[in-house]
UniProtKB/Swiss-Prot annotation:
It comes from Treponema denticola (strain ATCC 35405 / DSM 14222 / CIP 103919 / JCM 8153 / KCTC 15104). This is Small ribosomal subunit protein bS16. Gene3D superfamilies: 3.30.1320.10. Belongs to the bacterial ribosomal protein bS16 family. It holds the Pfam family Ribosomal_S16. Keywords: Ribonucleoprotein, Ribosomal protein. GO terms for biological process: translation. One of its GO terms (molecular function) is structural constituent of ribosome. SUPFAM superfamilies: Ribosomal protein S16 (SSF54565).
Length: 81
């Protein structure tokens, strides 16, 4: 099964995340199939979320399942699943 989930990057206490498409058997920071966006939780007062909507729709159409966190982030940007 393929999921759309967060891959943690950055330094200690200064994380940022890439929104990636991964096989569920891969570890969190393991091999990714595709990168579809970024999320900076502590960048500004308004947390920065950006993603390629066409790529997300494409992967959802192929059967990829977003994690709960990614689903909430997409909903914040008014992306309908």
């Amino acid at each position: 099964m393929v999921k759309i989930r967060l891959k943690r990057l950055g330094t200690k206490k200064r994380p940022y995340y890439r929104i990636v498409v991964q096989d569920v058997r891969e570890p969190r920071n393991g091999k990714t199939i595709d990168e579809v966006g970024i999320y900076h939780p502590i960048e500004t007062a308004e947390k920065q979320i950006s993603f390629d909507a066409d790529k997300v729709r494409n992967w959802l159409g192929k059967g990829a399942q977003p994690t709960d966190t990614v689903r909430r982030l997409l909903n914040k940007k008014e992306f309908t699943l």
